[in-house]
């Protein structure tokens, strides 16, 4: 064993333990704000504990989901506007959970970077905590990995992990039938999918992230970083009201690829593309990039972030429930015999 004043340290290798500890201290209040019934431990342990009985479950089935934010992070890194990507991370996971009929219970995050910048990391994790508060789940743990040589200066990556539960026998999808009505919930923009194409379109346009937004107010970068909408509380309110047979989170693959994931093999859907107004961001991208309608529909959410498949005789009542929760609801079409999605009308 060697010793001496000139011996190497972990800090010499580029890992700042003190910065990591400072980050934990800074984010503890944000994590504490997410506490809910069932949480049994705080940050800092080797594992996090959650009591399903204390959360009100008698015979629960657990559901897990994991996701990231994709290349939307590139825009956040380049602009320094990182506060919303934590909400994106939570939304991408918990919106998937509710498609199984599950209530999100807890969330864990993974933040990786080459050099830990405490303020940047704290802003991101505070965004994660905000997403957890809005969706009713607890931020009970996470990992901050400082890995010198693995990422260019200023770059980072994120991953999220969510666990939810529902009582046995209540899992979705269930009972989807021909004639069911499709209720679409409006998106808040591009959300967190298709950003490799988004970035190509912006490059082709010649605009910068700090340029004026060509489809609305503010700057282009700010507009494209609008956080993914959280559909948890409103979707679960509809499920509890009765008559919801399935939910589809419209992410990568757009309407064309995601809705069939919750339909039986022998059923498809007819969707009227005139049932909702295409948001300006999608009009601008289609026009600027010369993107065909079919490509838009299998890449982006095109203004519909979640679809509920509901019994026809419950469609009106569930529309009222969703609108009462603050949602903009469009009646998109119906479930039909035969595979695939058939579109009528025009998107563009």
From Swiss-Prot:
The record's section on InterPro entries has: PurM-like_C_dom (IPR010918), PurM-like_C_sf (IPR036676), PurM-like_N (IPR016188), PurM-like_N_sf (IPR036921), PurM_cligase (IPR004733)
Substrates-to-products reaction catalysed: 2-formamido-N(1)-(5-O-phospho-beta-D-ribosyl)acetamidine + ATP = 5-amino-1-(5-phospho-beta-D-ribosyl)imidazole + ADP + phosphate + H(+)
CDD domains given for it? PurM
Q: Name one Pfam family in it.
A: AIRS
One cellular component (GO) term of this entry:
cytosol
Keywords of the record = ATP-binding, Cytoplasm, Ligase, Nucleotide-binding, Purine biosynthesis
Subcellular location per UniProt equals:
Cytoplasm
- According to its UniProt record, this protein's enzyme class is ligase
* GO terms, molecular function: ATP binding; phosphoribosylamine-glycine ligase activity; phosphoribosylformylglycinamidine cyclo-ligase activity
Q: Which residues form a coiled coil?
A: none
Q: Per the UniProt entry, what are the Gene Ontology biological process annotations, in alphabetical order?
A: 'de novo' IMP biosynthetic process; adenine biosynthetic process
E.C. number(s) listed in UniProt: 6.3.3.1
Q: Does the keyword Magnesium apply?
A: no
Q: Which Gene3D superfamilies match?
A: PurM-like C-terminal domain, PurM-like, N-terminal domain
Pathway the protein contributes to: Purine metabolism; IMP biosynthesis via de novo pathway; 5-amino-1-(5-phospho-D-ribosyl)imidazole from N(2)-formyl-N(1)-(5-phospho-D-ribosyl)glycinamide: step 2/2
| Protein's UniProt keywords contain Cell wall biogenesis/degradation | no
The record's family statement is: Belongs to the AIR synthase family.
What protein is this chain from?
Answer: Phosphoribosylformylglycinamidine cyclo-ligase
């Amino acid at each position: 064993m060697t010793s001496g004043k000139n011996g190497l340290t972990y800090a010499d290798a580029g890992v700042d333990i003190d910065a990591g500890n400072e980050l934990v201290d800074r984010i503890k209040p944000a994590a504490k704000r997410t506490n809910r019934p069932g949480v049994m431990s705080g940050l800092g342990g080797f594992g996090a504990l959650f009591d399903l009985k204390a959360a009100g479950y008698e015979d629960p089935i657990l559901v897990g989901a994991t996701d990231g934010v994709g290349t939307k992070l590139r825009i956040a890194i380049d602009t320094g506007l990182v506060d919303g990507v934590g909400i994106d991370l939570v939304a991408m996971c918990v919106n998937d959970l509710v498609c199984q009929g599950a209530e999100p219970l807890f969330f864990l995050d993974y933040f990786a970077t080459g050099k830990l910048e405490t303020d940047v990391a704290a802003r991101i994790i505070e965004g994660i905590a905000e997403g957890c508060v809005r969706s009713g789940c607890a931020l009970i743990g996470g990992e901050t990995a400082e890995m010198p040589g693995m990422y260019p200066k200023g770059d980072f990556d994120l991953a999220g992990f969510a666990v939810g539960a529902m009582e046995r026998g209540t899992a979705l999808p269930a009972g989807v039938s021909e004639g069911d009505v499709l209720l679409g919930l409006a998106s808040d923009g591009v959300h967190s999918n298709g950003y490799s194409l988004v970035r190509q379109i912006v490059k082709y346009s010649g605009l910068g992230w700090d340029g004026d937004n060509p489809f609305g107010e503010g700057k282009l970068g700010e507009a494209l970083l609008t956080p993914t909408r959280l559909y948890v509380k409103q979707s679960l309110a509809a499920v509890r009201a009765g008559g919801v047979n399935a939910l589809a989170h419209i992410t990568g693959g757009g309407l064309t690829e995601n809705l069939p994931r919750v339909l039986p093999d022998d059923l498809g859907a007819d969707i009227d593309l005139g049932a909702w107004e295409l948001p300006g961001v999608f009009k601008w991208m289609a026009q600027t990039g010369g993107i065909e309608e079919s490509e838009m529909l299998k890449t982006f959410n095109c203004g519909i972030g979640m679809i509920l498949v509901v019994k026809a005789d419950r469609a009106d009542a569930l529309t009222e429930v969703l609108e009462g929760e603050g949602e903009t609801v469009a009646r998109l079409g119906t479930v039909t015999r035969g595979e695939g999605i058939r579109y009528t009308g025009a998107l563009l």
